[in-house]
């Protein structure tokens, strides 16, 4: 409990101090390849204290690995999440049990993804329903400190196989970039296809080094319920109304009910328009997955004013997919008589280069 209170107090202090112009230049991009660092430094210098903003994906972009995809089996391993506790609305298919294998929620999630990612993306945020934000914050911190692979069993091509998943591993380079941007008066937003509340527990907690403002974390939204009064809300609605109460929200319970914004695929670009700024584009966008981050990378960056795209090249098959997309997009722009920007200003780095 004391740790959670310290998190909230530190988050408020970080929000007040990180953007102070007196800190400009305090952070250096030491964990970036020299060429990439030079480009980013020039971008920051030319946009410092001019009302600019940047948008980053979280999982596999701002840290290595995936928060929800490790938290789910971690909480199953601890007995916190079980099939019996799963909200009935989330039991979309029969569980696939055998005499040797009682299917786990993690295996069930993978089978949801086999239907379509648009099914499993929301499901893996909804699966944590029934827990309070205070409980979830404690579990997220426990996961982040775990530092060991988490064993999993799941179906692959009809057979049960064993594997492991890793808890998130902080990218030092992204910590530096988040802080340098904010120190130079450039707002940093997180646009995640994961649960907004879960990601906020990492990126807005100063002990993890990003110092993002909790209000600037945008992700999959689930209604929060006050079990004493029955009142429904979300952090995003509170932020929109200027009534965000992070401390009070810790006692609220996550429900399985989805509401806008829905921040996956083209929804990330739509959320920039609807929840950040309809007309002003970000000067920097970061991502790692073509279909999930591609729309905001291609359509969201103000390239004509020097804006840049950071691509974390973490999977061999994704790089040619993204490159093909930006080449096709550039041809489409040219055919339409538009400024050809889709293939411009890409900064490509590998995970180990920013670790």
Label every model-predicted segment.
Residues 2-14, 22-58, 66, 71-93:
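Non-catalytic pre-domain segments flanking phosphatase-related domains
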Residues 68-70, 75-76, 80-165:
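A metal-dependent, Asp-based hydrolase signature
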Residues 27-39, 45-47, 51-53, 138-189, ...:
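C-terminal cap/substrate-recognition subdomain and adjoining C-terminal extension
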Residues 1-2, 192:
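Charge-dense, intrinsically disordered terminal/linker segments
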Residues 66, 118-119, 197, 266:
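A generic alpha-helix surface/boundary motif
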């Amino acid at each position: 409990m004391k740790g959670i209170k310290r998190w909230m107090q530190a988050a408020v202090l970080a929000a007040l101090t990180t953007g102070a112009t007196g800190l400009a230049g305090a952070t250096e991009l030491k964990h970036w390849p020299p060429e990439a660092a030079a480009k980013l430094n020039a971008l920051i210098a030319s946009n410092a204290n001019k009302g600019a903003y940047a948008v980053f994906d979280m999982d596999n972009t701002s840290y290595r690995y995936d928060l929800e995809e490790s938290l789910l089996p971690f909480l199953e391993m601890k007995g916190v999440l079980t099939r019996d506790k799963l909200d009935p609305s989330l039991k979309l298919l029969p569980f696939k049990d055998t005499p040797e294998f009682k299917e786990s929620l993690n295996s069930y999630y993978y089978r949801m993804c086999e239907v379509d990612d648009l099914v499993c993306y929301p499901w893996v945020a909804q699966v944590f329903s029934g827990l309070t934000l205070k409980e979830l914050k404690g579990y997220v911190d426990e996961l982040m400190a775990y530092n060991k692979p988490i064993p999993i069993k799941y179906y692959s091509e009809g057979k049960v196989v064993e594997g492991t998943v890793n808890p998130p591993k902080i990218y030092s380079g992204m910590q530096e970039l988040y802080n340098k941007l904010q120190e130079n008066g450039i707002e940093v937003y997180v646009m995640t296809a994961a649960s907004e509340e879960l990601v906020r527990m990492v990126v807005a907690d100063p002990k993890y080094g990003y110092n993002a403002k909790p209000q600037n974390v945008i992700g999959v939204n689930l209604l929060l319920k006050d079990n004493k009064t029955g009142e429904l809300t979300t952090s995003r609605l509170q932020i929109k109304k200027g009534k965000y109460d992070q401390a009070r929200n810790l006692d609220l319970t996550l429900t399985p009910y989805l509401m806008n914004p829905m921040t996956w695929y083209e929804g990330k670009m739509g959320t920039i328009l609807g929840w950040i700024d309809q007309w002003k584009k970000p000067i920097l966008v970061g991502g790692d997955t073509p279909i999930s981050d591609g729309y905001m990378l291609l359509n969201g960056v103000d390239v004509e004013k020097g804006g840049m795209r950071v691509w974390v090249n973490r999977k061999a098959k994704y790089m040619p997919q993204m490159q093909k997309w930006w080449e096709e997009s550039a041809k489409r722009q040219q055919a339409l008589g538009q400024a050809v920007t889709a293939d411009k200003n890409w900064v490509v780095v590998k995970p180990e280069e920013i670790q």
